[in-house]
Amino acid sequence: MLFADRADAGRQLAETLLARLPGLANQRPIVLGVPRGGVIIGREVARALGAPLDVIVARKLGAPGHEELGIGAVAPDGTRVLDGEIVAALGVSDAYIEKITRRERAELDRRMQRFRDGRLVPDLSGRAVVLADDGLATGVTARAALASVRHAKPATLVFAAPVCSEDGCRTLGAEGYTVVCVYTPPDFRGVGEWYADFEQVTDETVIAVLRQAATGPP
């Protein structure tokens, strides 16, 4: 185990981020946590950067009959990425992809309304944006979230997580994203095994953290 819990992991990630990108705090940074666990990570990173904390939600698109297997992901603005190899290997139809995209977008809208709690979506143009999650496995959900943020034309866009798979890092790097991780194990088998406490984060906790962050410095 490398991390006691997500708060500990977030603090370690913040140290790594500041060491890798020392000028980041001077680029009007904003941290976007990926719910649910990434919001706890993001809180610690935002504190270290003196930056506001906000949220971005992306949803995995599950394979037919095996929804735990992601064939892609979709972000709130409709940005969608697909894993072409898996789609082809499973023979997933365009009709199925459109159907599940509509379903997951509806869930995205519901979650964004719940998490945002009436707050406006921040303007990311020209800012340094750090997308924080509690880990990176395949990277498909991160790709959708990052592509969505990229449309907002930030000056700098970084994906940051305490533990990342080598494959996930390569995938994001190949698309031009800066990736910062505390640890990239050669034998990655899952995000949770690197945490002593990887208890599920509730929607209520996410909402409370975001509300508290909203009352802090801009």
Describe every region a protein language model picked out:
Residues 1-218:
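PRPP-associated nucleotide enzymes
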